Amino acid sequence: MIKDCTRREFLGTLGTAVAGICVSPARLAFASRAPTAPVAVGRCYIYGAEVVQVLSTMFDQLGGLERLVKGKTVAIKINLTGLAANRLRHLPLELTHWTHPQVIGATVHLLGQAGARRIRLLESPMSTAEPLEEFMLQANWEPRDFMSAAPVVEFENTNYLGRAKKYSRLWVPDGGLMFRAYDLNHSYEDCDVFVSLAKLKEHATAGVTLSMKNCFGITPCTIYGEEAGRDEPSLVPRGGRGMFHHGERQPSKSALSEIDLRSPRDPGYRVPRVVADLVAARPVHLAVIDGVETMMGGEGPWTSGRRHVKSGLLIAGTNCVTTDAVAMALMGFDPIADRGKPPFETCDSTLRLAEDLGVGSRDLRQIEVVGTPIAQAKFNARSA
């Protein structure tokens, strides 16, 4: 039975970027019309009770959670990329490339306090249809800590059909860049509020992985994986999403195929467009980025040049593009940068593509930053 939990009780139990581009006046005019929203930045140096306190202040600075979640079902996509056995120098996964359980639990707790009716923790664990809770246990996490953080907390592995009888088809407004629609686990449709709870990292293919790239993982490998079924989705997910990276095959025939089969097969072209499509089709209402401790040089221990970094940051906003723009600036990158410039040396900018789709603005001049100023918290991701 799931019990109610006071703030004090929760704190006690959880404990534990083609060289240079010319931007046309027309492009700038469109960008200036893209939606914008404030972004909160908070300093947090350790994963303790401070996480709840800092996040609570940040959410208040954004206007409070109650107006967003009271009486509603909230879905939270967390970032548990790779396998539980993938570690950087034997460090716990949550100190490098996974969203930290303290940040997950604190967010769940504050959403519950704000009156969320139901909270679902979602992720698509690699190559398995086992319950998400079991995947967490492999990393020595305790799912019951999350269950005690709010009155009703559920878990779902979204890498396959899950508990529903059919997949949900989410359409990209105005037609999409790579696909017109994506077939997803029901949990991404059966919610009133969608939260992307990400990690502050660079990415070998997409330049950075923040609140938008985190949504790449909402796609089920039973349809979009290398070993997905040809006609119908496979029953169990196997392998990764190489289809999105290289385009060597199409999704299961039950889903829609690519818009243009003659488009480039370059992962640096394809992946950013898929991500931009996804955040347009499944809008993010709240973006939270864990940068207290993380890794740079890539998205996981399997990339080269990776290193553990203590950046001491939490970032949150109600628009995923504006939030990622501020996060990029905090990492020492220019959010207006595109292919050929750091961190997008070999890829197109997901931020620019999402901005072009009208999701949000990446122009810092249009974004109000509340809490800690960028200048006071900025670090160099390439030398940290």
Tell me what each language-model feature is.
Residues 1-2, 21, 71, 207:
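A general, composition-driven signal for non-globular sequence regions
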Residues 30-384:
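Extended, low-polarity segments enriched in aliphatic/aromatic residues
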Residues 23-27:
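C-terminal segment of classical bacterial N-terminal signal peptides
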Residues 1-18:
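N-terminal secretory signal peptides and thylakoid transit peptides that target proteins
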